[in-house]
């Protein structure tokens, strides 16, 4: 899950989701605060969290445990933060991150740097592009080929 806390951070969050899909072949769900507080926080109690699981993730010898409980397969919340957050959005981001952590969801908060909106979005987008290529390499995925896009283009041509 990738959330943005302002118009600038929301645009960067959209870019991060797209790059996670394209470069790392890794699914991502986009959200912009405050709307995410009405629907996406429900995922904190869902299938991909320890709070929503009935098995014991601490027992690696449990043959029948669902591997979704392994930390690398769980839900991860990334919140892109901006200095121009509305105070209510700031409180919602802080509360949502705390709720996620309380439920065993990994949380990463990345803050835009700079004063001008263009500078702030550039810092977040540059970080997003770098992180997604790095993640692809860490997962053993070549980030350059896009066979699914090529296939889709061929099917609609």
What residues fall within each predicted segment?
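A SIS-like phosphosugar-recognition module
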Residues: 1-157
């Amino acid at each position: 899950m990738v959330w943005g806390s302002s118009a600038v951070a929301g645009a960067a969050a959209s870019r991060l989701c797209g790059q996670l899909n394209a470069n790392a072949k890794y699914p991502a769900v986009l959200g912009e605060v405050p709307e995410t507080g009405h629907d996406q926080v429900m995922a904190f109690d869902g299938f991909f969290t320890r709070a929503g699981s009935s098995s014991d993730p601490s027992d690696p010898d449990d043959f029948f445990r669902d591997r979704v409980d392994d930390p690398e397969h769980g839900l991860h919340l990334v919140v892109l933060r901006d200095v121009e957050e509305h105070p209510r959005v700031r409180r919602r981001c802080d509360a949502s991150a705390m709720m996620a952590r309380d439920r065993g969801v990994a949380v990463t908060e990345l803050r835009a740097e700079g004063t001008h909106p263009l500078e702030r979005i550039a810092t977040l987008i540059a970080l997003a592009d770098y992180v997604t290529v790095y993640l692809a390499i860490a997962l053993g995925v070549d980030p350059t080929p896009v066979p699914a896009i090529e296939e889709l283009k061929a099917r609609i041509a």
